[in-house]
């Protein structure tokens, strides 16, 4: 009789431990799912930021090229104006 009670007690203890392990596993599984969701959100954000960065870099490059073109045009106009002024001064000096 004592042996039967001991087996029952051991079985109950093992069943309780098994339930605790199942609960812990379920909790860890849920945590893993939440972390996976968070990781996906971070990856999506990172991708969106990378796309924005690429767009901004392209705009920056275009603006730098436009600026260079405008500076060249301004320098050319200033040189043309200076040439005209020099020609006018030369004409007046005759």
UniProtKB/Swiss-Prot annotation:
**Assigned keywords, A-Z:** Autophagy, Coiled coil, Membrane, Protein transport, Transport
Membrane disposition? Peripheral membrane protein
Q: Report one GO cellular component.
A: phagophore assembly site membrane
The record ties this protein, via Pfam families, to: ATG16 (PF08614)
Where is this chain's protein located in or outside the cell?
A: Preautophagosomal structure membrane
- Is this entry keyworded Protein transport? yes
Q: What sections of the sequence does the record tag as coiled-coil?
A: 2-77
Q: Where mainly located?
A: membrane
Per the record, the GO terms for biological process are: autophagy; protein transport
- Its signal peptide is none
Its quaternary organisation is: Homodimer. Part of the ATG5-ATG12/ATG16 complex. Several units of each may be present in this complex.
Function recorded in the entry: Stabilizes the ATG5-ATG12 conjugate which is necessary for autophagy. The ATG5-ATG12/ATG16 complex is required for efficient promotion of ATG8-conjugation to phosphatidylethanolamine and ATG8 localization to the pre-autophagosomal structure (PAS). Also recruits ATG3 to the PAS. Involved in endoplasmic reticulum-specific autophagic process and is essential for the survival of cells subjected to severe ER stress.
Family, as annotated: Belongs to the ATG16 family.
What protein name is recorded for this chain?
Autophagy protein 16
List the source organism.
Yarrowia lipolytica (strain CLIB 122 / E 150) (Yeast)
Q: What taxonomic lineage is listed for the species of origin?
A: Eukaryota, Fungi, Dikarya, Ascomycota, Saccharomycotina
């Amino acid at each position: 009789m004592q042996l039967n009670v001991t087996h029952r007690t051991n079985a109950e203890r093992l069943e309780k431990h098994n339930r605790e392990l199942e609960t812990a596993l379920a909790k860890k599984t849920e945590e893993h799912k939440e972390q996976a969701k968070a990781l996906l959100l971070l990856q999506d954000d990172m991708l969106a930021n990378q796309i924005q960065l690429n767009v901004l870099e392209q705009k920056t490059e275009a603006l730098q090229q436009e600026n260079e073109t405008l500076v060249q045009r301004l320098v050319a106009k200033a040189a043309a104006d200076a040439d005209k002024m020099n020609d006018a001064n030369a004409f007046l000096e005759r």
